Swiss-Prot record:
Molecular function terms from GO: aminoacyl-tRNA deacylase activity; ATP binding; proline-tRNA ligase activity
Assembly, per entry: Homodimer.
Protein name: Proline--tRNA ligase
Reactions catalysed: tRNA(Pro) + L-proline + ATP = L-prolyl-tRNA(Pro) + AMP + diphosphate
Lineage start: Bacteria, Pseudomonadati, Pseudomonadota, Gammaproteobacteria, Enterobacterales
Source organism: Buchnera aphidicola subsp. Schizaphis graminum (strain Sg)
Amino acid sequence: MRASKYLFSTLKETPHHAKIISHQLMLKSGMIRKLSSGIYIWLPTGIRVLNKIKDIIKNEMRKINALEVLMPVVQPKKLWENSGRLSIYGEELFQFYDRRNQKFILGPTNEEVVTNFIRNEINSFKELPLIIYQIQTKFRDEIRPRFGIVRSREFIMKDAYSFHINKHCLEKTYNDFYQSYINIFNKIKIQFRAVNADSGSMGGSISHEFQALSENGEDEIVFSKNTAYASNINTAKSMQSINFLKEKNRIIPNQIKSKKCTKNFNEFKKPIKNFIKTILVRTKINNQPSLAALLIRQEHELNLFKIEEIDIIEKPLSFVNEEEIITLMGVKSKFLGPLGLKIPIFADVSVYYMKDFTIGSNINEKFFINVNWNVDLPIPIIKDIRNITKKDISSDGSKSLEIKKSIEIGHIFQLGKEYSKKMNVLVQEQHNNYKHIHMGCYGIGITRIVASVIEQNYDDNGIIWPDSIAPFQVVILPLNTKNCIKIKEITENLYKILKKEKIDVILYDRNERPGIMFNQIDLIGIPHQIIISPRHINENKVEYRERKNNKSTLIKVKEITYFLKKKLNLI
């Protein structure tokens, strides 16, 4: 490629609406342009990166015998009604009517479509196992699109689906995908963790997320420094909560006899220690709206995902605000406590182990102090409802935990018979019996990978792409070609040789000042730069500059091709 024939579309200034570094650099480097909220045009530089990621994914899919297909973007709404997921996705679905007044959806995912296809296509166990995949644009009506392509209304995904006659076969394929994803992300050179996760709206029993580490990520993961333990913080359990499950049957409630002394709020000279917060949330019991109380240590954070797992809690989770608490309970939320509440009370496991603690008294400006379970208060319903912390011991016994922000770039699920039962997908067994098939599904967020790699690889000058997905691997930067025939000859000759060697190279043949040329190339992030200048050409040498460390080396012209091939691991 010659720069004179290429659309760079770089910007000098950072657009004011771009808040995170990946969004800023994708706009500045000319990878994308915003069309509307959460909707972007992909420009040539962005497309080149996307295509290289797709190629890596396709190569790995071929290794596990996955067959490429292409499913429609438009899906009949009836399929989603059959699976029961229409209400779960709710307003996130783009829905529309055709001219015949039939209802359709722009697909955010393809479980319904692919299950319907298999139901009509596969009849016998002899046709299984089967793995199919596609790379396609998906749609989701995000309420608040943000962070550029990290949370957008349309995005590109690789989604794969596997079909099996039994659970053992599904587990084998699941493990193949798990390793395949590790291979993909290692080739892309992205820092990630594979973590235990919840299946959420996808259903199924077992799932793993692949999370790219990023300070601007929306997710949080917890992992051990010393062991293989890693989990999404939503599902992470401490050793304390696991041990409680083993001993909870031995809890014997006592008759409550004593009454606790109170202490005025203004008597506390320091922040209150050993304090239990009481938080009200909405519930639905027998379809009747009501309230429940959640008890948690002052220093802990509620885990919204775990709370929604409680049957009676209203979904989505809804907290009672300050004004409502004062109206309903006659007290400010700060002084709300569990004593005397006539509603269900759920306490975190860590709260159960507390002694001589402080709670709100349900009287403004007063607390109960030195409170104990089974003495002053009946033991409530104990649940794991908080986020794990660095001070916790993980479920595998690790005492050295890290909690990091991350971006989800992949997710794999063992769906089991979740969809085949709902949509009645049966195949004939060896003995002429019919049974529901087992399914797995496996997603990679291709556009999210682009943002995640940039979040991990940049400096003050721009993006620093890994070789494997850089828009170009090598750029040739000739200086003063108009006045030096030798520079022009060497430049053209090197360009032809590199193209012949199948090296992805761009020749910067635009008539620009060196400063503009170098700034543009650094911003785009081409990893290997060859500078051909009058300063060194008389010695038959060119300057090699590596983008990731900005180090320069003089290389003989006749050795530069071998040098680059070695750098690119081509020999």
